Amino acid sequence: MKKAAIWKNLIICLVIVIVLAVFMDPQSPVSMEALDKELLIKGNSGYTIRIIYAEIQHSELRESLDYGVIVSGENERREKSGTWRNEEFGEYRICVDAKVDYCIVLYTESEIQVVNIESNESTASLYEAILKLADDTE
């Protein structure tokens, strides 16, 4: 095989790998860990939101939310985490997978937290579990 053909094939393979890397949907950047009295929502960036069930005063499942602007934290293609500000809440804490529309808004005495996990369905299930756990701690 000629050198030009080898280089051509190499470039084609490289382009295919790059396209796959860009368009493949990797695992969600947000994970959760459920403990007895709290829930941890963790971003790949290392940012963690600690939700203590007994401190939840009110919660809502939203099908969409205007996240606003970042104050500090991450604003990546898939992960939004840290402290953000929008017109509705002012400053609040967030840890979400940006490709998931649904999110859970949690109100405590001291702050507002916005979280979601890998899919709309998983986020809705998590919301139902949080409602039950928050009721059980009252």
Predicted regions located by residue number:
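Terminal and domain-flanking low-complexity segments
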Residues: 60, 98-138
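N-terminal recruitment modules of adaptor/scaffold proteins
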Residues: 5, 13-14, 35, 102, ...
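Alpha-helical transmembrane spans
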Residues: 1-31
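Context-gated lysine
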Residues: 2-3, 8, 37, 42, ...
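Short, structured coil/loop segments at alpha-helix boundaries
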Residues: 4, 44-46, 119, 123
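Non-transmembrane, membrane-adjacent beta-strand/coil modules in membrane-associated proteins
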Residues: 42-53, 57-109
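Conserved beta-hairpin
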Residues: 21-52, 58
